[in-house]
Amino acid sequence: MILFSLLAGAASAQNLSAGNVFAGYSFARATLAFGQNANLNGWNISAEKKYLPFLGIVVDASGHYGPANISAVACNGASSTCYVSGNVQESTFQLGVRGSYSTGRIRPFAEFLLGAALVNQSAQGFSNSSTGLIATLETGIDIQLTRHFAWRTDAGLIQTGSFPNGQNSLRASSGLAYFF
């Protein structure tokens, strides 16, 4: 009886994914300082190590880049704020938990991540960098393509209070996940 229990446990453990890695395209709708918005394109990578069939630890990194109208004080000798064309770079590194449930070829998941973000804004001879703590709440779905590969799509809200006036960004990513 004990041997049967051990063999059944080992067999079911082989069916569980020990973890996964993901790499894909990512879009962010970033709210910058002073209420400005920027549509940024970039990449997102993550790795998950499963500790329970439905719970894992996640490491996540992303980079987003793009043009934006950036506020500048006293442009052209004026005393009011004006906007100049510039560039934005946003990099994030986070750690958190992911809950998931596999049913057939579909695996929906939700995750909560904490970490840091670095935002660089530059335009016409000036630049501004901000670093702050961030929290991300995200949901997504993996659709199994083969035994080891799945297509992942996820979206969520990135919140920070450390940048001037705070920042709320939306992020959506899609790409290939490898399960091991």
Region annotations inferred by a language model:
Residues 1-17:
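Cleavable N-terminal export/targeting peptides
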Residues 30-33, 78-85, 122-127, 158-163:
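Extracellular loop and loop/strand-boundary signature of outer-membrane beta-barrel proteins
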Residues 140:
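Hydrophobic/aromatic beta-strand elements that line small-molecule binding cavities or substrate pockets
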Residues 22-26, 60-62, 111-113, 154-156:
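Transmembrane beta-strands of outer-membrane beta-barrel proteins
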Residues 27-46, 130-133:
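Surface-exposed strand-loop-strand hairpins of Gram-negative outer-membrane beta-barrel proteins
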Residues 15-32:
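Short N-terminal segments immediately surrounding and downstream of signal-peptide cleavage
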Residues 48-124, 132-135, 143-145, 170-179:
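Gram-negative (and chloroplast) outer-membrane scaffold detector with strong preference
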Residues 137, 145-180:
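Predominantly the C-terminal beta-signal and adjacent terminal strand-loop region
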